[in-house]
C-alpha cells in the first residue's frame, strides 16, 4: 500500500533555522534504510512560508498571496513536482491548473535542495523545484471531480510533461481513509479521518510503499522521535 506522510511546519522551520547536521544525518540514515529496501518512493522538504505563494480562485478570478503567511486550508488532494526556471513560470502553470478547477486553492512551495540545508554547495544555475499543492475540496473528499475536469487536468499534465516542467504527480485518496497524528513529547494522539483542513503548513512529505497502516504508523513514530517528539503528521493513502 502506498502512503504519503506529511509533517507540518514548526516555529523553527518557519523561522528558516537550519536543522542540526546530526539530525539531518540521523533522519537520512533512517529514511535511507527504506530507500535501500525500495519502500521510499518519493519525498521532499519545503521551505518556510516566505518562500511560498498561495493562489485562490473564485468566480473566474485568481488572487495571489506571497508569503510569509499562516496556514489555513492545508488538506491536499494532489501534488505536482515542477522544475522551472522562475517562480513566475510556476505561477503561470498554476493559474492554468486553477482555471480548470474553478473555485479552489493552490499553493506553490519551494523544495529544499541539499545546498539549502548545508549538505553540499549549490551547482551553477540550478533549476527551481516547486511543489504545486492542489487543495482538497468537497468534490475530492467525496466522489471526486467531474470527468470533464479530470480529463482537462490530465491534458494539462501531459503538456507540462512535454514541456519538461512536470517531474511527477500524485493523487491522494480522501482523508476519510487517512489519519492525523499529533505527537506531544512522543505521546501520540491519533485522529481518524475524515478530518478538516489543518492550520499548519506542510513542511515536507515522504511517499512509502509499505504493508499497511500499522507499518506507516511505526515509521511516523520513529520520525517524530528524531524530530524532537512534538509535531503533527498527516497520513494519506495514495491512489
Regions found by a protein language model. Give the residues of each.
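Conserved, structured core segments of small domains
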Residues: 1-239
